[in-house]
Amino acid sequence: MYKRLFISRVILIFALILVISTPNVLAESQPDPMPDDLHKSSEFTGTMGNMKYLYDDHYVSATKVKSVDKFLAHDLIYNISDKKLKNYDKVKTELLNEDLAKKYKDEVVDVYGSNYYVNCYFSSKDNVGKVTGGKTCMYGGITKHEGNHFDNGNLQNVLVRVYENKRNTISFEVQTDKKSVTAQELDIKARNFLINKKNLYEFNSSPYETGYIKFIENNGNTFWYDMMPAPGDKFDQSKYLMMYNDNKTVDSKSVKIEVHLTTKNG
């Protein structure tokens, strides 16, 4: 009897160790923010147009490119030209760490991301706080090209549900040609829609007090980005876009997106 009890306890202890040591969905999931966790547009006294610029048709987009250089160990430089405004012909994307940069260094990739100019450095000779001519910077936004596109140029629709003051007021879809797509690409497309349809960002302010965009993956994991700038009178585009440096990707067929907004009079 004692032997059987001992064996049962050993099995129980082993099972507990296995549960503790095995990553689980809830542990990896980012909980929804509390109201005090979010930036408030009323506490930002700068120009909201600087935020709007990041999501209003000024993004970097390129297919089948390969890095040609780097500045630091955790970034990659590509020959990508601005076909619309002719503002740049080189793009540097900064990643979370050196390992992530090495992963894509010699790969043929697609690049899609929001870019900035001030505090964009390609070498130690670039002037601090100045715009480097012909060059622009971004974070993340990389996906491997080979095998990551749908057949016959098909596109995948991704559902976005918008909640204003906790009420679902509008739903729409954004499209991507990628099987594995960066959250940044979907975020840009969702916010661009909301700028055009809901005036998400205006020149001086926003009709919304708080906002966050939430991604729900097929395994139940969730994560979100704050959609408003930090309090103060200045908006640092580089610092804000840094949230994309982990190059987070999602499965375009299964991911769901929610946008949660509160109005200033709500």
From Swiss-Prot:
Taxonomy, superkingdom: Bacteria
Known role: Staphylococcal enterotoxin that activates the host immune system by binding as unprocessed molecules to major histocompatibility (MHC) complex class II and T-cell receptor (TCR) molecules. In turn, this ternary complex activates a large number of T-lymphocytes initiating a systemic release of pro-inflammatory cytokines. Also causes the intoxication staphylococcal food poisoning syndrome.
UniProt keyword terms in alphabetical order: Disulfide bond, Enterotoxin, Metal-binding, Secreted, Signal, Superantigen, Toxin, Virulence, Zinc
Assembly mode: Interacts with MHC class II molecules composed of alpha/HLA-DRA and beta/HLA-DRB1 chains. Interacts with host T-cell receptor/TCR beta variable chain TRBV8-2.
Pfam families hit by this protein: Stap_Strp_tox_C, Stap_Strp_toxin
Binding site for Zn(2+): D36, D110, H145, H149
GO MF annotation list: metal ion binding; toxin activity
InterPro entries registered for this protein in UniProt: Enterotoxin, Staph/Strept_toxin_CS, Staph_tox_OB, SuperAg_toxin_C, Superantigen_bac, Toxin_b-grasp_Staph/Strep, Toxin_bac
A GO cellular component entry from the record: extracellular region
Localization in the cell: Secreted
Name of the protein: Enterotoxin type C-3
Chain ranges passing through the membrane: none
Species in which this protein is naturally found: Staphylococcus aureus
Family indicated by similarity: Belongs to the staphylococcal/streptococcal toxin family.
Signal sequence residues: 1-27
Disulfide bond positions: C120-C137
UniProt xrefs under PROSITE patterns: STAPH_STREP_TOXIN_1, STAPH_STREP_TOXIN_2
Main location: secreted
